[in-house]
Amino acid sequence: MLEKVETFDMNRVIDEFDEMTRNAHQVQKQTLKEILLKNQSAIYLQNCGLNGNATDPEEAFKSMVPLVTDVELEPYIKRMVDGDTSPILTGHPVPAISLSSGTSQGRPKFIPFTDELMENTLQLFRTAFAFRNRDFPIDDNGKALQFIFSSKQYISTGGVPVGTATTNVYRNPNFKAGMKSITSPSCSPDEVIFSPDVHQALYCHLLSGILFRDQVQYVFAVFAHGLVHAFRTFEQVWEEIVTDIKDGVLSNRITVPSVRTAMSKLLTPNPELAETIRTKCMSLSNWYGLIPALFPNAKYVYGIMTGSMEPYVPKLRHYAGDLPLVSHDYGSSEGWIAANVTPRLSPEEATFAVIPNLGYFEFLPVSETGEGEEKPVGLTQVKIGEEYEVVITNYAGLYRYRLGDVVKVIGFYNNTPQLKFICRRNLILSINIDKNTERDLQLSVESAAKRLSEEKIEVIDFSSYIDVSTDPGHYAIFWEISGETNEDVLQDCCNCLDRAFIDAGYVSSRKCKTIGALELRVVAKGTFRKIQEHFLGLGSSAGQFKMPRCVKPSNAKVLQILCENVVSSYFSTAF
């Protein structure tokens, strides 16, 4: 998504955003009014008692339409997937259905995808780019190294196209037209982006980037995991890539005919470039600064680096060297929410300003005790320093939909809140009175990984599970690590993991033995890649994949993969 600066009025886009955010309250009321007008014939809204005649549509909406999750909407969306063209959630048939990654619950969710969501995507890309390009100007004639993988759509039994959200965006006929004035070419041919084989596509993305190395302005993947995975793969295949460049002949590993044809057109024998890449790679110390070494004119590295992606940031920073890491914007399969308008902030500090016309937003206060539930507040009513669950209403038939994301209000951009992603609300480790979030798990792993780093070893990936097969139940943490070390070190890591969970309920439960000793389970190399392959087989896009941090019992296949690949385990002696 590299944009051509000469045809893009950066200042106008920023001015429009400033105007909209100054009037955030009015924009929210108008957005809800338009959503309800557009979908007034929807059966769901009529069942709630909305008939379009309310004198105050906003108050009527909030009093008559309940807060829901995907569970309540699933029967309605299933009818749409099955081909029911009546106005179920929207006033008109939806052109496609999106699949979520499915990593949280072990199964993908179906989510309506409409032309309005496509327009929202284009608006957010324009807004975010304006602020990004103001801080990190790019060359008009540059290219982007984008690790994009657009999986296939399939047609449901009811005749509706179904694909991941990213696939629905990239395959939408309006995408290229809408991005034309703000897009410079990707290094990779379309045949690579739409390849049915993600492994071959990744190899070709890397090769394409190096062929155009001097033109690359930034490096992008939707998620930080995708960037780290790409350059870990490069460590393994770089010599093969160098040979391809030297001889001008594509590796035999590329067997998809369309991909092979497209890539072969880019390749001619280039011994000089091959030797340059070989020299660069051989001169690096443990691959530090790999990205700027390969792409000397790159301005930054770009992708989602918050939330469940935060554990990958240290490794990504290692590859990026001195290049800035810029956090991608805030959204989900259900729709976009906010843009990064402060791109110079590090991923750890990144905040996102809500774009008031992307949907109607409410925020459900998160109770520290978890007892009772307060009423949601509006976009401009949130308070700095408080945490909320995001509730979204959009044009695609989601009404007062609890997103499950917990965010913290860091400040305001004019009158729209700037949010920091905290965690997924339902990803909580809990056995007794303990409550540990995804963020708590990340902090625990980061703390224990410091002991491992003393041995020049790193945590490649991790997940967790509540093991209640023992009495009392206990936390099981799965680690895949980059090398071998002695048992004493791993025992230290296990104890450190246990001590790092500082939730009062957990500590007291451990001390009185109502929660058992934490277990560290080390798995074989490649285990987490097997998990990714599992989700790709379910229809997830490689670019959309997120590793499940807390494996639920319903996620039986993932748990099976983890347990079958355990090579050693350790029980904490910290308490």
Swiss-Prot record:
Q: What induces it?
A: Rapidly induced by auxin. Accumulates locally in response to wounding.
The residues that the entry says bind an L-alpha-amino acid are 166-170, 530-534
Q: What is its EC number?
A: 6.3.2.52
Q: What is its main location?
A: cytoplasm
Q: Which residues bind ATP?
A: 98, 118, 121, 163, 168, 331-336, 557
- Regulation affecting activity: Activated by GSTU20/FIP1.
Catalyzed reaction equations:
a jasmonate + an L-alpha-amino acid + ATP = a jasmonyl-L-amino acid + AMP + diphosphate + H(+); (+)-7-isojasmonate + L-isoleucine + ATP = L-isoleucine-(+)-7-isojasmonate + AMP + diphosphate + H(+)
Q: Where does it localize?
A: Cytoplasm
Q: What class of enzyme is it?
A: ligase
Q: Which UniProt keywords apply?
A: ATP-binding, Coiled coil, Cytoplasm, Immunity, Innate immunity, Jasmonic acid signaling pathway, Ligase, Nucleotide-binding, Plant defense
Q: What is the effect of changing residue 101 to F?
A: In jar1-1; insensitivity to jasmonate, Strongly reduced adenylation activity
Instruction: From the UniProt record, give one GO term of the biological process aspect.
Output: cellular response to auxin stimulus
Q: Name one GO molecular function term.
A: L-leucine binding
Q: Which GO terms describe its cellular component?
A: cytoplasm
- Relate the outcome reported for changing residue 303 to R: In jar1-5; insensitivity to jasmonate
Chain coiled-coil ranges: 10-30
Could you tell me which InterPro entries the record lists for this protein? GH3 (IPR004993), GH3_C (IPR055378), GH3_M (IPR055377)
Q: Which Pfam families match?
A: GH3, GH3_C, GH3_M
To which protein family does this belong? Answer: Belongs to the IAA-amido conjugating enzyme family.
Complex and partners: Interacts with GSTU20/FIP1 under continuous far red (cFR) light; this binding increases its activity and determines the priority of substrate binding.
The protein's name: Jasmonoyl--L-amino acid synthetase JAR1
Organism encoding this protein:
Arabidopsis thaliana
What does UniProt list as this organism's lineage? Eukaryota, Viridiplantae, Streptophyta, Embryophyta, Tracheophyta
Q: Which gene encodes it?
A: JAR1
